[in-house]
Amino acid sequence: MDKEPITADGLESLKEELIFLKEKKRPQIVAAISEARSHGDLKENAEYHAAKEEQSHNEGRITEINDIIARANVIDVTKMSNDGKVIFGSTVDLENLDTGEKITYKIVGKDEADLQKKLIFFQSPIGRGLIGKNKNDLVEIKTPAGVKNFEIKDVKYV
């Protein structure tokens, strides 16, 4: 079982989701199954089948989270001295040299990556292009949308 890097925040989020799924959602689903079962014939009971499917998804996610937590290698960058180098868990302020757009990404593990929240998987094209670079470096990153040029404006360990 290979260890997977995860930030302290990412691990905490997974633990919170696990508690929610076990203590809140699981009892709600059991109640929905019980309610649907009381309606009679289970073969043509859409409510029952929908609740059972939701139960399957919920239990699958619980298993998945337990596996992620078991494999977690927590990296807490707040306990490291910041030398301006982009590392796993660091927050990076960038300027797109082609458009002038400023953007901030946090470099994270695969199980916590979320582009909408600007959480970038360290093995993604952008993550690989930034890891090991330093504040004020100019970087050229090959993305699916083409080559992008950035300047690293700041690197924070938060």
UniProtKB/Swiss-Prot annotation:
Superkingdom of source: Bacteria
Residue runs in coiled coils: none
Keywords, sorted A to Z: DNA-binding, Transcription, Transcription regulation
Any one biological process term the GO annotation gives: DNA-templated transcription elongation
Pfam families registered for this protein in UniProt: GreA_GreB, GreA_GreB_N
GO terms assigned for molecular function: DNA binding; RNA polymerase binding
Entries under HAMAP family matching the protein: GreA_GreB
NCBIfam families: greA (TIGR01462), PRK00226.1-2 (NF001261), PRK00226.1-4 (NF001263), PRK00226.1-5 (NF001264)
Family: Belongs to the GreA/GreB family.
Role this protein plays: Necessary for efficient RNA polymerase transcription elongation past template-encoded arresting sites. The arresting sites in DNA have the property of trapping a certain fraction of elongating RNA polymerases that pass through, resulting in locked ternary complexes. Cleavage of the nascent transcript by cleavage factors such as GreA or GreB allows the resumption of elongation from the new 3'terminus. GreA releases sequences of 2 to 3 nucleotides.
Protein's recorded name: Transcription elongation factor GreA
Lineage: Bacteria, Pseudomonadati, Pseudomonadota, Alphaproteobacteria, Candidatus Pelagibacterales
Encoding gene, per UniProt annotation: greA
